[in-house]
Amino acid sequence: MTNMKFGLGLCVVFLTLLTGNRAVEAEQIQPQHFLIHMKTSLAEDDAQICAGPNVAWALVKAGHQVTILVDASAVTSVTKGFGWFGRLVHSDTTALDLARLPERERVSLAEQMGVSLEEIPHQYGEYLGFLKEMGVTIYGNQTMMLLYNIDFDDVAPEVTPIALNRMVELFQSADRIIVY
């Protein structure tokens, strides 16, 4: 009986050591560089471009470095007064400036991020500025901007236009790439 208790005790100690080491390993996750590649404009699919900022915030909160690359048709969503009608009516705002975060999303973000509702942005354009203040770097594909005939001065101030070679560097240096 004593040998059985001793054996059982050793098993418990061994399992405790194993699970204890796993818990320590899980806590020591190294920060990574995430590149969020946002390619779909607000006009094409609002769910995709609007999900990117939420993921960016969650990654920053988890201690990761985050870069957002606005590409393809999404460059139109960060351009002031894009389109013929926009130039006449909203020449000083972007599509993201005009897109409000639904109240239920704001409430959910406040709960998930552990902040007050007052700290949550009201529009997606404001959200980009909020992320930039948190250390997120935001770039835009200047070649796509040229193809859409976008003047760099009309791009949201949070977005820095970059050339293709710089984009290649972003893709090569990222530990993980998330595409929206």
What is each model feature region?
Residues 66-72, 139-142:
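Short internal beta-strands
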Residues 37-50, 78-81:
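Short, glycine-rich nucleotide/cofactor-binding loops
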Residues 69-86:
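Acidic helix-start/capping segments at beta-turn-to-alpha-helix junctions
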Residues 9-19:
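Bacterial N-terminal signal peptides
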Residues 23-26:
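Boundary at the C-terminal end of the N-terminal hydrophobic targeting segment
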